[in-house]
Amino acid sequence: MVAYSILTLISLGLGSHCASALQYGYNQVPVHKDSDVVAGAFPPINGTHLQSPAFTTPGTVPRDFSDGKAGPTRDEIMDNFLRRLARSNGWMAYHEADFMSEEGRKFPYLYLSGTNSSLENPGSGKKLRVWLQGGVHGNEPAGDQSMLALLGEMAQNQQWTAKVLEKMDILVLPRYNPDGVFYFQRYLATNFDPNRDHVKLARQQTRDIKQLFTKFNPHIATDMHEFSAGRAFGPKKDVIYAADALFSAAKNLNIDEGIRQLSEKLFAKRMGKDIEAAGLRWDPYITQGDSTNSKLLLLEAGTDAKIGRNAMGLTQCVAFLCETRGIGIADQHFERRTLSGLVMAKSIIQTAVDNFDEVYNTIERGIDRFTHSKGSIVLTDKSPISARTFGMLNSTDGKLIDYPIDFASTTPATPVLTRSRPRAYLIPQSWTDVVKRLEVLGLKAEKLPYSYTGRVEALNVTSVAFDKEYYEGVVTATVETKLVEQNMRLPAGTYLLSTTQKNAALAFVALEPEYMDSFASFGIIPVSKGDQYPIFRLK
């Protein structure tokens, strides 16, 4: 077994298949539908009756969906569907967010509660809060369609829904990226990737949705996506992923270990069984790595905080990425794809209901344990590599095969660089923009009315290495520092950010310069070799 550094694994992943050069709008991927041989491995599932607009009102599906130039459900169709459900069900409340997309589109969402609780009045009972989102990438239509199918099924199966809502309140944001859906492209209207903006918070839309998420404060969060269907491997490029579904829990090691184990040992295991029971296939979410030999290297979902599932998980909740096989095949197998997403979402809900006390208590204890922890924080990690097989499909003859691979596992990753957990951070008033970003992430900072004089831990920059590529407006940097203790005087107005907060792990990944997605890495706090980093730590 060998180790593979996470810092070399940063990848846009299975959903990154995009046009080589971006324009304003309509950045659509080429369509390569499955051959008849491959399609035979993904037949319709008997007895499927999905209760979402693409299936209950097929006449509303645009013709361009079959050509891979549009999704199946326009905004107005989705909005009417949500409003109709809310009018017919007292446990369902329709809302429009008080912010708009980059091009001025609305964000409808539904709040589901059996006790009339809401964002403003969440109630005082012992209940789980579950956040479900889809449509982060606009060219992954089974993501938001599976959310609509879930809502439709809950409206149809009132008895099941009543049992669910005894244990939890649910917020469903079906369409995170309405501009991307309009253009049928992965990106926001500004061509930023919405699923890589969770720490740097470059776009206002990201900040607005993040604040809604923080206000809801979920115990469980799920992010619905699709992955590229036709990615081929092997010497003859005749081997493709066989899975209908790929999924991953949040992997960042700054998430409480008890919460991570709950995700892996309870939720992930149950999800795999539920997918198989539905007649579907699954594997862990992976991306392709650069192998040093002829063997295919697949990398399990990484630990980077800029990605949605890890950013959500760093609020100390159970968080899952759920992906279905769909990018690049337009409307092909859409019922099976949507069913795959629905099965995963229902599995998470049902697992939480069936194991309510264990889930609720483990998460609440994990939050308390993390908040008051004095353990070290993890800044870099690595993945052990081992040989295993992965479910593949031979595209020539349609046979399912167990394909030998090298697998870089993050369940769990192995810490490399750790650092003592600070009691607090001191942030000079001149860096108010940094404080505002941290507040969006759900953190609170106190503005000191007096000057601070005393011992601090300062970080002196010993190395800055820039990436070779331009990424979303910046050239990212890998920063190394040396920690030194010294006396410091900081003026009144300096911010004190205590780390005795539930969301403190988001401060760690943002403020510690060595972390791959830190504010220093993204140039929000620019540094050079020899500089003193302008954020200070208290022991």
From Swiss-Prot:
Main location: secreted
Pfam families xref list: Peptidase_M14
Catalytic site: E323 (proton donor/acceptor)
Biased composition (Polar residues): 49-59
Signal peptide (from-to): 1-21
Molecular functions per Gene Ontology: metallocarboxypeptidase activity; zinc ion binding
PROSITE patterns linked to this entry: PEPTIDASE_M14
Cofactor: Zn(2+)
Key word DNA-binding present: no
EC number(s) recorded for this UniProt protein: 3.4.17.-
Principal EC category: hydrolase
GO BP of this protein: proteolysis
Protein's UniProt keywords contain Glycoprotein: yes
Region: Disordered, residue numbers: 49-72
Family listed: Belongs to the peptidase M14 family.
Protein role: Extracellular metalloprotease that contributes to pathogenicity.
This protein's name: Carboxypeptidase 2
Name of the gene encoding the protein in the UniProt record: MCPB
